[in-house]
């Protein structure tokens, strides 16, 4: 009886999911994954498991991630204070080096490893790879330093990764038109389908 109930429950979930699977199979969805949602290991595992499942049923997923808490921890470890203006990180010369190391290194590779653990094939990238994300310095009333706004996306590296059956996991570090590296603000606009986890 228990087995029958479980099988019935799984069939019910599958039946409810099928219209969405049919609708989005072959589509590309961008998942924006904020650093605060990475603090809870159980939640992080659930997110990776869900994305691996989406890929398995034919949905192409691009995971774009931040990592604010990890950046804060590294800055604290080197004796540097995290500074913010209007909720945005003030990013000077030393901070952008740490941001790049943490986001494109530690956080990105940890997510790749976790995705692989949950059955997804993943490749870690950052916006610098193939000039995938191009940014301009964000101009606000306060000088935020190396904080940029994405102005252009080169989809070719992402498409190559997806076409080879992998999930691209992208750190939000971007190339500047001025030759600098920027911590990028990600605004995912239509017609790109999106899911935001923050």
What do the predicted segments below correspond to?
Residues 23-118:
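Metabolite-binding pocket within alpha/beta catalytic cores that recognizes anionic/polar moieties
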């Amino acid at each position: 009886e228990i087995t029958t109930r479980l099988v019935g429950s799984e069939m019910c979930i599958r039946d409810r999911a099928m219209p969405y699977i049919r609708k989005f199979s072959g589509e590309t969805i961008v998942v924006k994954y904020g650093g605060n949602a990475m603090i809870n290991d159980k939640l992080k595992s659930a997110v990776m498991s869900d994305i691996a499942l989406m890929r398995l049923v034919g949905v192409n997923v691009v995971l774009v991630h931040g990592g604010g808490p990890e950046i804060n921890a590294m800055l604290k470890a080197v004796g540097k204070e995290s500074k913010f203006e209007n909720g945005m990180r003030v990013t000077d010369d030393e901070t952008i080096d740490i941001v790049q190391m943490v986001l494109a290194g530690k956080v990105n590779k940890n997510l790749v490893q976790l995705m692989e653990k949950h059955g997804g094939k993943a490749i870690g990238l950052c916006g610098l790879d193939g000039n995938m994300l191009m940014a301009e310095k964000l101009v606000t009333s306060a000088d935020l330093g190396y904080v940029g706004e994405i102005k252009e996306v080169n989809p070719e590296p992402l498409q190559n990764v997806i076409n080879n059956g992998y999930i691209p996991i992208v750190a939000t570090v971007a190339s500047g038109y001025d030759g600098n590296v920027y911590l990028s603000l990600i605004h995912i606009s239509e017609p790109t389908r999106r899911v935001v986890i923050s």
